[in-house]
Design a protein with these regions (language model features):
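PP2C/PPM-type serine/threonine phosphatase catalytic domain
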Residues: 2-267
Length: 267
């Protein structure tokens, strides 16, 4: 399978919201093994969300779509206070969880999905990202030379890492690495984690399904994200690297370049 077969992608999109200038691109590829793509992405000025469905056949695809459809209702023309947006997201996730559980009862399949990403909000009048996560999809940030995973995986191996029983390197090859502990649907707890982080003068943000970080190390991801190429090429390189490493799962990436109005975006 080439990088173009079955691939969905956006062109570079530009937007300004709440004093932050943004450009972004999203790519979703089924990978080299899976016949269907159960990932989904939702993007707009100040809203960058991803869902990785599970359940086989069309159940996972329906689950991820249901989550993103519910979360789309949170979008507004200007950023709202972080606490208000958080409460809205919790309500929408609850609605999505109920809808996905109904998929189980109608089809007999245990549908579920992860959700991760960022929404631009304000905190004490200053632009902040509200980061949300449930499951093992990830949100990263590269700013001022510092690369960090903003989210924490809800997975068995992450719990073992936290308990000191596995190293991150061991977790990458552990047979339990794909077992998640939270999701929307799938008979799991739908409790999301949230973080409120200040928007930086210039930052690159990456939202991805585990089809990316399951194939590439954080160092490999950082090297590509830190390269001096347009963000569409950066996204292409991330997906291509995951496919070249095996492409055993669907691979979806959202790459965002964000700059506050106090600095020159130099686009």
């Amino acid at each position: 399978m080439t990088a173009d077969e079955g691939e969905a992608r956006s062109e570079i999109v530009y937007g300004v919201q709440g004093g932050v200038s943004m450009k972004w691109v999203a790519i979703s590829n089924p990978g080299r093994v899976r016949l269907t793509n159960e990932d989904g992405a939702l993007t707009g000025p100040g809203m960058f969300l991803l869902a990785d469905g599970m359940g086989g056949h069309d159940a996972g695809e329906v689950a991820s779509a249901a989550a993103l459809e519910a979360l789309a209702e949170v979008f507004g023309p200007e950023p709202a206070e972080a606490q208000v947006v958080m409460e809205q997201v919790v309500d929408r996730l609850r609605d999505a969880h109920a809808a996905i559980e109904a998929i189980d009862s109608e089809t007999g399949k245990r549908a579920g999905t992860t959700v991760t990403g960022l929404l631009l909000t304000t905190y004490e009048g200053v632009p902040h990202w509200l980061v949300v996560n449930i499951g093992d999809s990830r949100t990263y940030r590269l700013a001022e030379g510092y690369f960090e995973q903003l989210t924490v995986d809800h997975s068995q191996v992450q719990e073992l890492i936290n308990g000191g029983f596995l190293s991150p390197e061991q977790a990458r090859v552990d047979p339990r690495r794909n077992v998640i502990t939270r999701a929307l649907g799938a008979g799991m707890e739908p409790d999301a984690d949230f973080w409120i982080v200040p928007a930086q003068p210039h930052e690159k943000l990456l939202v991805c399904s585990d089809g990316l970080n399951g194939e590439l190390t954080d160092d490999e991801i950082r090297q590509i994200l830190d390269s001096d190429v347009p963000i569409d090429e950066c996204a292409d390189q991330l997906v291509a690297a995951a496919l070249n490493a095996g492409g055993r799962d669907n691979v979806t990436v959202i790459v965002v370049d964000a700059t506050t109005e106090q600095t020159d975006p130099d686009w």
